[in-house]
Amino acid sequence: MGRMLTEARQRVQDALQWLWQQEGTPGQRARGLAAGIFCGCFPIFGFQTLLGIALASVVRGNHLLAAAGTWISNPFTYVPLYWFNFRVGSLVLGPGRPWPGFDAVRQEGFSDVGWSVLTRLLLGSTITGAVCAALGWWLSVRWLQRAGS
């Protein structure tokens, strides 16, 4: 059992090392990672990777690291990340309408209720994504330059 864990840990370390040694300058790799982190903060399931790669192309970042960066959101982090994003958006825009019950949605229409939630979620995602991407860029540039790549 201990041997299997050691081998698994070594494989993960090798995969991470391979990922970090992708082509490009430290700045290009950091921009790719930051683009992926930014897109990973948005609730656009299935399109985060594509948008992360597209954004990495715009900022001339590494595409593979952009795809990896989108995994900041995954099945384990969806609920806490999007709840946090919604709370950040609510902090900026105000609390808005309270979360509706089924009767309110049926009477007022889902689009009216959904717009209040969606605007707060998207604004919070933008703010959280920008902060996390900037932090990820800064940390990865420092780490890559220190590693001497």
What is the predicted role of each segment?
Residues 21-39:
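Small-residue-enriched transmembrane helix starts and helix-helix packing motifs
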Residues 34, 38, 68-72, 123, ...:
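Hydrophobic residues within alpha-helical transmembrane segments
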Residues 42-85:
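Transmembrane helix boundary and interhelical junction motifs in multipass membrane proteins
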Residues 79-105:
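Juxtamembrane non-transmembrane "cap" segments at the membrane-aqueous interface
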Residues 89-97, 139, 143-148:
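Membrane-interfacial segments
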Residues 97-119:
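Short, membrane-exposed interhelical loops at transmembrane-helix boundaries
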Residues 122-145:
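Transmembrane alpha-helical segments in integral membrane proteins
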